[in-house]
Curated annotation (Swiss-Prot):
Residues 39-328 form the Protein kinase domain. Pfam families: PK_Tyr_Ser-Thr. It is an enzyme of class 2 (transferase). It comes from Arabidopsis thaliana. This is PTI1-like tyrosine-protein kinase At3g15890. Keywords: ATP-binding, Kinase, Nucleotide-binding, Transferase, Tyrosine-protein kinase. ATP binds at L45, G46, E47, G48, R49, F50, G51, S52, V53, K67. Residues 351-361 have a biased composition (Basic and acidic residues). One of its GO terms (molecular function) is ATP binding. Belongs to the protein kinase superfamily. Tyr protein kinase family. The active site is at D165.
Amino acid sequence: MQLLNSCCGKGFDGKKKEKEEPSWRVFSLKELHAATNSFNYDNKLGEGRFGSVYWGQLWDGSQIAVKRLKEWSNREEIDFAVEVEILARIRHKNLLSVRGYCAEGQERLLVYEYMQNLSLVSHLHGQHSAECLLDWTKRMKIAISSAQAIAYLHDHATPHIVHGDVRASNVLLDSEFEARVTDFGYGKLMPDDDTGDGATKAKSNNGYISPECDASGKESETSDVYSFGILLMVLVSGKRPLERLNPTTTRCITEWVLPLVYERNFGEIVDKRLSEEHVAEKLKKVVLVGLMCAQTDPDKRPTMSEVVEMLVNESKEKISELEANPLFKNPYSSNENNREHVAEESSDVILEDKDHQQQQE
């Protein structure tokens, strides 16, 4: 495990760390087999591109979530080492804490805190969706806390980190329904002097991927912002990021939301399970911020720090300023002089997904 030892036992200057040792430990494979009942299917919490996640209980009674890689190769060796390195660096209350890892033989496993409220997607579209546990206050808390986590990765982690896979299933919820962003399997460490084009990853479009990342596979901070914008609209509406209209056509959530914004029909966007409990101005703000993040032109998207500022700002003047953005003006208005300009602006948020045949989450 030269790669793993390299990233966990030494600093980036090659010297052994004397301080700031990670607060997690190495687990034995035997210990994790016992905790998960030999990775029993009944303990399985979910499955992602890198592997499966299992619930477990240690000898002291504490609950854990164990991510077990399903395949192993040189590529996975690098991915695992990168993920451990990332997890060793980050310290933020809204990023999922790692308790340790296991690297024995061909087994590579990461051990996390267990989140009893599972993931955001389980409450929107999964096993808890019928219970409607997410009221408007909880959704706002999730929006702000997840934005703060990603902003931390972009601006305060050293080096900065691109998450690369922001979506509802990677937002876990603690006992207070605070977001715990997880899954840095596609994350990329970015030195401050990095001038590259980002990491290249092969992904299928799941509705959260920005147009430029979908085309090139290259991730960036701005592609994270796009994904977060989609996440905001999913959170507010309760809809999936992609809707299949017929066997050959899918529609991105922005294509449904933007026409309703033109009409200022924000009430039609909100999840019907919320009834009338939402605050109209706050709903409007979250939708507008989501659409600003999801513009197809990366240069026009806000930074995640700016997103946090917009979400926490309660000023009605700020909401009016957002609403006045040309992006939200109806291109079919009667003002012929503005039509061409506004149509160009509004097209920045529309993403055609008619050629995609992908899963919804």
